[in-house]
Amino acid sequence: MNLQKINDEVFIAQDAIVKIGGGELAFLKDQARTNLRKRARICAHKSNDDALHEMLIAISAQSYIHPHKHLGKSESFHIVDGVVDVVVFDDRGEITEIIELGDARSGRNFFYRLSESAFHTLLIRTDFLVVHEVTNGPFLRDKTVLADFAPAEAQTVEAAEYIRQVAARAAAFMKHGN
């Protein structure tokens, strides 16, 4: 596959027919291991302006996904490899739902679609998560809202502690079913 490197995290597939297999998964995981934010993606769409965005994304369990929401967008995940809990929050940072996902071998659901704008983050339960994400374009940075109830990505110590707290809250949420 011909890839155009945009930066250490983003690669654009240049072929008219995009095919992704084990070699590309290994490539993405290697890229994610070595970059600062511990994630990497291959975009099947060619431009931020495309109406449909499809990405294969490898995310290390060491990566902090700042709780965020996308205004006016839907997104779906199909889990290719790994296990994750998608934690959904209200605007105050209270957990409203946990979506337990995994690849087909895991016994968990392997697909979800978030049709309405809601804050969410990922608790990755395996060393790596590989997802096929689909969302509507265009990508406009100002349509992604970062939750003010969570630390910024640059606050690495606080972010790590926050994720530990979210994991504990998520466990209690799942235990009590609320």
List the model feature ranges, each with a label:
Residues 1-52, 97-104, 159-178:
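A short, N-terminal "cap"/entry segment at the start of jelly-roll beta-barrel domains
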Residues 38, 56-73, 116:
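Conserved short histidine dyad/triad with adjacent acidic residue
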Residues 49-50, 72, 127:
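Short strand-connecting beta-turns/loops that link adjacent beta-strands
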Residues 49-52, 60-64, 83-85, 92-94:
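Short, charged/polar surface micro-motifs in flexible loops or helix N-caps
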Residues 66-68, 86-88, 112-114, 120-125, ...:
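Short beta-strand His + acidic residue motifs that chelate non-heme Fe in jelly-roll/DSBH
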Residues 72-92:
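Glycine- and acidic-residue-biased ligand/ion/polar-headgroup-sensing regions
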Residues 76, 90-120:
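Short acidic-glycine-tyrosine-enriched beta hairpin
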Residues 96-98, 104-106, 121-178:
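Double-stranded beta-helix
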